[in-house]
Amino acid sequence: MSQPLIAFFALEAIVQLIAMSFLQIGMEKERDELHQKLAAQTDELTGAANRRSILQRADTLLASCRDRHVAAAVLLLDLDHFKSINDSFGHDIGDNVLKATAVTLSGVLRKGDLFGRVGGEEFACCLPNTSPPEAAAVAERIRNAISKLCLMYSGVAIRVTVSVGIASTERAGYDFQELMKAADAALYEAKARGRDRVEDETAQPRHAVFRERLAS
């Protein structure tokens, strides 16, 4: 092989190496940007959507339901006696309870449903194309599945229960913040009625404090 031809192939190889290096740098940058985007949308502990993410995604989903004139619902969940679990068994066990709850929600919810951790021991779900009876059925499946969770700590079985509040677009409109308020009032009514239960926004408050919360 002649010297000019050898030099040509050597130059071509160098050019290819440079091109591959730029491609790799570009792919790494794209991967880093994707990782940062996902991290900004994800609750670090549970892997579920964080509050900011579910607020944004739920608004989009509810707008689509409104435009198509179909019902939707929002569920607000709060783990019962979670502070007692943390105080009695430690925050590591509390973290495990939150993780197990997220896994349970992921397994129970339907394709197209959204859920995320919105703070502390609270999770929110947005259910598109869902009537009030269907929302109640989903909420009850969630409550039942979580009631079957059992974590062990030093030979002690830790049982977990959850209270769930439901708000439907048929009664509360399509604004996510308003739906969350209605679901929050229903959730506190579930707490007032003994916990480990599901209530919707039609529940009549049993105590003045809950009546005031619903009216505010």
Mark where each language-model region is.
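Catalytic core regions of nucleotide second-messenger enzymes
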Residues: 146-162
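A short pre-motif secondary-structure segment
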Residues: 114-117
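Membrane-embedded alpha-helical segments, specifically the hydrophobic cores
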Residues: 1-31
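Short helix/loop segment flanking the catalytic signature motif in cyclic-nucleotide metabolism enzymes
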Residues: 97, 110, 124-141
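Conserved nucleotide-binding and Mg2+-coordinating catalytic segments in signaling enzymes
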Residues: 37-56, 77-91, 99
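Catalytic-core segments of nucleotide cyclases and related cyclic-nucleotide turnover enzymes
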Residues: 136, 154, 169-216
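Short regulatory alpha-helical coupling segments
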Residues: 38, 51-71, 102-110, 128
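Residue-level recognition of strand-loop junctions within catalytic nucleotide-signaling folds
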Residues: 87, 127-130, 147, 169-170
